[in-house]
Amino acid sequence: MGRFRGGLRCIKYLLLGFNLLFWLAGSAVIAFGLWFRFGGTMKDLSSEDKSPEYFYVGLYVLVGAGALMMTVGFFGCCGAMRESQCVLGSFFTCLLVIFAAEVTTGVFAFIGKDVAIRHVQSMYEEAYSDYLKDRARGNGTLITFHSAFQCCGKESSEQVQPTCPKELPGHKNCIDKIETVISAKLQLIGIVGIGIAGLTIFGMIFSMVLCCAIRNSRDVI
């Protein structure tokens, strides 16, 4: 009996440790998602009328999952401390929802990468054409693109040189740079989503083991 209670206590502390880690991971995911959405390249693009909302869907899911992770981490600690089967069962269900959300984010980021790249490239092509037709009307949008992606023009930068960043060393094709930047960012989002999903699996295992151990201990008593 003493050995059984010792094992139960060990599982409980493992779950408590997991929930602390899970809460911190949730905070990091929210910070990561908000920084990705409102910082740097994406901050510049979001100010445009035709901002790439398709690109942001995965980030919205990621931030929502991060908020849920923080909440679930807190209730998971409560369930482990109180040894409540009901709370642990709810905790397991929430982890399952988070797992599905993170896998969706990861898959969406990897599969939707080409669509997002083409969408942003078409936005640039349109801004480029507008500038050549009316330099006053298309000036602001093109400057935003060149500043966000640190590039200038397409095959040549001569026609759009006034909109290029002054600190940019040499010519950099914006079509190629957009593909490189968006691909890298979406790949990072996908890796974070899949990584959190993997962490969630351990939480589901710990919660089920503890729930079964609590039930068995009460049966013994």
Curated annotation (Swiss-Prot):
**Superkingdom assignment:** Eukaryota
Transmembrane segment boundaries: 14-34, 55-75, 91-111, 189-209
The protein's recorded glycosylation sites are 139
* Keyword Transmembrane helix appears in the UniProt entry: yes
InterPro entries attached here?
Tetraspanin/Peripherin, Tetraspanin_animals, Tetraspanin_CS, Tetraspanin_EC2_sf
Topology in membrane? Multi-pass membrane protein
The record's keywords, sorted A to Z, are: Glycoprotein, Membrane, Transmembrane, Transmembrane helix
Cytoplasmic compartment segments: 1-13, 76-90, 210-221
Ranges facing Extracellular side: 35-54, 112-188
Name the principal localization, coarsely classed. Answer: membrane
Kindly indicate whether the keyword Glycoprotein belongs to this entry.
yes
Q: Where found?
A: Membrane
Q: Cellular component terms, GO, for this chain's entry? A: myelin sheath; nucleoplasm; plasma membrane
A GO biological-process term? myelination
Described by its record, this protein's role is as follows:
May play a role in signalling in oligodendrocytes in the early stages of their terminal differentiation into myelin-forming glia and may also function in stabilizing the mature sheath.
Q: Which family does it belong to?
A: Belongs to the tetraspanin (TM4SF) family.
What is the protein name for this chain? Answer: Tetraspanin-2
| Gene it is expressed from | Tspan2
